[in-house]
A protein has these predicted regions:
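Bacterial Sec-dependent signal peptides at the C-terminal "C-region" and cleavage site
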Residues: 20-29
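Bacterial N-terminal signal peptides
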Residues: 10-20
Length: 170
């Protein structure tokens, strides 16, 4: 019985740790994870995944800041996410597409500690960069290509910031 209890505790601890690293809920069709592996997307679909991912990052970092305080780089990156949302919104307007509602709050989970928060940031930026790499392989209008390149570059900067902070824990 004691051995079974120990195994159950180990399993619960492992599942908790895994959930902390993957704190962006794994929605089937939302943000970068929703776009993963899809090809032949329209500009509207790509912009939708893009803004969902920006909404998702903002919601996650708001949650982290609310729990752990206004620490960098979360505060800086959350401000950047606001700008990114504005940029994507401008193209929705320009192309006459309906702007998706921000439902990102349904897709985030609070990481258990700051280290897990930085791990979450690292994974989110990796997913975001991969999404834009995929989009940039498409034939895109110049303004959309420019936007995706700027957002990908910003994600590369955010990834560096999260990795630098995560390295303090290792």
């Amino acid at each position: 019985m004691k051995r079974l209890s120990t195994k159950i505790l180990v399993l619960v601890a492992a599942l908790t740790a895994a959930a902390a690293v993957i704190s962006f809920a794994e929605s089937a069709d939302f943000g970068a994870r929703g776009a993963e592996g899809k090809s032949g997307l329209t500009v509207e679909q790509m912009l939708t995944y893009s803004i969902q991912d920006e909404y998702l990052a903002r919601a996650e970092y708001e949650l982290i800041i609310g729990e752990y305080g206004g620490i960098r780089p979360f505060t800086n990156i959350m401000a950047a996410e606001e700008r990114h949302i504005e940029w994507v919104t401008e193209l929705f307007d320009e192309y006459g597409y309906a702007l998706p509602a921000d439902t990102a709050g349904r897709h985030v989970v609070l990481p258990e500690d700051l280290k897990s928060s930085f791990e979450t940031g690292v994974q989110a930026e990796i997913d975001n960069i991969a999404m834009y790499e995929s989009f940039l392989k498409q034939d895109l209008p110049a303004d959309v290509r420019d936007l995706f390149e700027r957002l990908q570059g910003a994600s590369e900067n955010h990834l560096r910031a999260f990795r630098n902070n995560l390295n303090r824990y290792n």
